[in-house]
Swiss-Prot record:
GO terms for cellular component: cytosolic large ribosomal subunit. It comes from Bartonella henselae (strain ATCC 49882 / DSM 28221 / CCUG 30454 / Houston 1). GO terms for biological process: negative regulation of translation; translation. Part of the 50S ribosomal subunit. The lineage of its organism: Bacteria, Pseudomonadati, Pseudomonadota, Alphaproteobacteria, Hyphomicrobiales. Belongs to the universal ribosomal protein uL13 family. Keywords: Ribonucleoprotein, Ribosomal protein. This protein is one of the early assembly proteins of the 50S ribosomal subunit, although it is not seen to bind rRNA by itself. It is important during the early stages of 50S assembly. This is Large ribosomal subunit protein uL13. Pfam families: Ribosomal_L13 (PF00572). GO terms for molecular function: mRNA binding; structural constituent of ribosome. Signal peptide: none annotated. The keyword tRNA processing does not apply. Coiled coil: none annotated.
Length: 154
């Protein structure tokens, strides 16, 4: 029996929507990364973009465990000498673009390279509950119901 290898023309992509309200960030990001890569499918092929299109809503209501809300730091460099900058997760979540916390968590769980960048383009994250993808008829997934540790009630 030969190993199955899916061709890019055989890929069938679905649209799924996940409500991130009160979900633990890392657990949500791991679930979304697996969906984007297509690892949940029996037809998974490592070199083919086989994942689904994922919409995450209510990203501003994400939950972080422990003291990560105040202590977790996101670093970046401006390109100038001594230009290292940082912001805490709290500053980002209370700032203009709170969805970036979820985007960064998922981005760092996907392999770096051309295929990873293509798979990451299938992720859409929105801070509120509104999204412009109703025409795609996304299937709702309840990540909180999969495991009791996925949801944080505090």
């Amino acid at each position: 029996m030969a190993t199955f290898s899916q061709k890019p023309t055989e890929v069938v992509k679905k649209w799924v929507i996940i409500d991130a309200e009160n979900l633990v960030l890392g657990r949500l990001a791991a679930f979304v990364a697996n969906r984007l890569r297509g690892k949940h499918k029996a037809t998974f092929t490592p070199h083919v973009d086989d994942g689904d299109n994922v919409i995450v809503i209510n990203a501003d209501k994400i939950s972080l465990t422990g003291k990560k809300y105040t202590d977790k730091k996101y670093y970046w460099h401006t390109g100038y000498i001594g230009g290292i900058k940082k912001r805490t997760a709290r500053q980002i979540l209370e700032g203009r673009f709170p969805e970036r916390v979820v985007e960064k968590a998922v981005e760092r769980m996907i392999p770096r390279g051309p295929l990873g960048r293509r798979q990451l383009k299938n992720l859409r994250v929105y801070a509120g509950s509104q999204h412009p993808h109703a025409a795609q008829q996304p299937e709702a997934l309840d990540v909180g119901a999969l495991n009791r540790k996925n949801k944080r009630i505090a």
